[in-house]
């Protein structure tokens, strides 16, 4: 893994900083674990935009990831590491003795030829998956389940990790990078280690077109629109919008509370927004 700054042979190349990964597989993904994927471009079943500034982008195929890690006690061998266009982390193709192959999220320290296993008696080693009750305190973990058997939902993006802070009865207490501390049932599974591609946030795309390849469209200011498109739109010449900042639907922005339920979960001990 290395950061490479391109030579300014054109305005679009001048500010590009790439993260180079020579260890990644250069061929096609494993076909039986690939599905076609249709973009909905942030439209709902009525065709209305639910999230602005999405659309276009390069065609992607979805890689089926094993988030449950339910092959108990069977040691698998990592055949290769791969790029996945659907997530910031890298993925690893694991071959099991029965001939089955599965994709998993690749943590730091797992490479071609590494052995990974899932189960209560699995050693504490990057890539292995255990119930939280079998992981020692202070361990760095990722791919954390919220409900037993549902599959990992937390800490899955590049460079992410959490720490097992304590165990209290049937619960384990997890400390997130965001500052949030929460309780999770101790029978839920988690994987050891930190997610790969930790330099993902250091890259620079360099030009607007690189954003478009990823399905991100321009962010247009409300005051630059027409009155039909935004409450701040219209006016002769440049205007300030003429009112307090609002969203396209007229809701006050910049700190206005829209959530009705004040408490998100009784499992959260320390909120990530509290200083």
UniProtKB/Swiss-Prot annotation:
Q: Which UniProt keywords apply?
A: Ribonucleoprotein, Ribosomal protein, RNA-binding, rRNA-binding
SUPFAM superfamilies, from UniProt? Nucleic acid-binding proteins (SSF50249), Translation proteins SH3-like domain (SSF50104)
Molecular function (GO) terms for this protein are: rRNA binding; structural constituent of ribosome; transferase activity
UniProt record, GO biological process: cytoplasmic translation
Write out the GO cellular component annotations.
large ribosomal subunit
Q: Which Gene3D superfamilies match?
A: 2.30.30.30, Nucleic acid-binding proteins (2.40.50.140), Ribosomal protein L2, domain 3 (4.10.950.10)
Positions of the UniProt region annotated as Disordered: 208-275
Q: Which InterPro entries match?
A: NA-bd_OB-fold, Rib_uL2_dom2, Ribosomal_uL2, Ribosomal_uL2_bac/org-type, Ribosomal_uL2_C, Ribosomal_uL2_CS, Ribosomal_uL2_dom3, Ribosomal_uL2_RNA-bd_dom
Biased composition (Basic residues) is annotated at 209-219, 254-263
Superkingdom of origin organism:
Bacteria
Function comment: One of the primary rRNA binding proteins. Required for association of the 30S and 50S subunits to form the 70S ribosome, for tRNA binding and peptide bond formation. It has been suggested to have peptidyltransferase activity; this is somewhat controversial. Makes several contacts with the 16S rRNA in the 70S ribosome.
Task: Give the family, as the similarity comment puts it.
Answer: Belongs to the universal ribosomal protein uL2 family.
Q: How does it assemble?
A: Part of the 50S ribosomal subunit. Forms a bridge to the 30S subunit in the 70S ribosome.
Q: Could you identify this protein by its name?
A: Large ribosomal subunit protein uL2
Organism per entry = Coxiella burnetii (strain CbuK_Q154) (Coxiella burnetii (strain Q154))
Q: Lineage of the source organism? A: Bacteria, Pseudomonadati, Pseudomonadota, Gammaproteobacteria, Legionellales
Gene that this sequence comes from: rplB
């Amino acid at each position: 893994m290395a950061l490479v700054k391109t030579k300014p042979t054109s305005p679009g190349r001048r500010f590009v900083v790439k993260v180079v990964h020579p260890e990644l597989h250069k061929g096609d993904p494993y076909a039986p674990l690939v599905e076609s994927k249709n973009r909905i471009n942030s439209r709902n079943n009525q065709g209305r935009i639910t999230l602005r500034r999405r659309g276009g982008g390069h065609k992607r195929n979805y890689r089926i990831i094993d988030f449950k890690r339910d092959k108990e006690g069977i040691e698998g061998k990592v055949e290769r590491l791969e790029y996945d266009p659907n997530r910031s982390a890298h993925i690893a193709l694991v071959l099991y003795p029965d001939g089955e192959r599965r994709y998993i999220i690749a943590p730091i320290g797992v490479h071609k030829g590494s052995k990974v296993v899932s189960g209560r008696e699995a050693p504490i080693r990057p890539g292995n998956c255990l119930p939280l009750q079998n992981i020692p305190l202070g361990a760095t973990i990722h791919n954390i389940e919220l409900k037993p058997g549902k599959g990992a939902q937390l800490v899955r993006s590049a460079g992410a990790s959490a720490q097992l802070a304590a165990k209290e009865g049937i619960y384990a207490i997890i400390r997130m990078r965001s500052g949030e501390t929460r309780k999770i049932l101790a029978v839920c599974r988690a994987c050891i280690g930190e997610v790969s591609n930790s330099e993902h946030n250091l890259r620079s795309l360099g030009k607007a077109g690189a954003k478009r390849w990823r399905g991100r469209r321009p962010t247009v200011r409300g005051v630059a629109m027409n009155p039909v498109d935004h409450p701040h739109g219209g006016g002769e010449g440049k205007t300030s919008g003429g009112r307090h900042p609002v969203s396209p639907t007229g809701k006050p922005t910049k700190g206005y509370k829209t959530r009705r339920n004040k408490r998100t979960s009784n499992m959260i001990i320390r909120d990530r927004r509290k200083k």
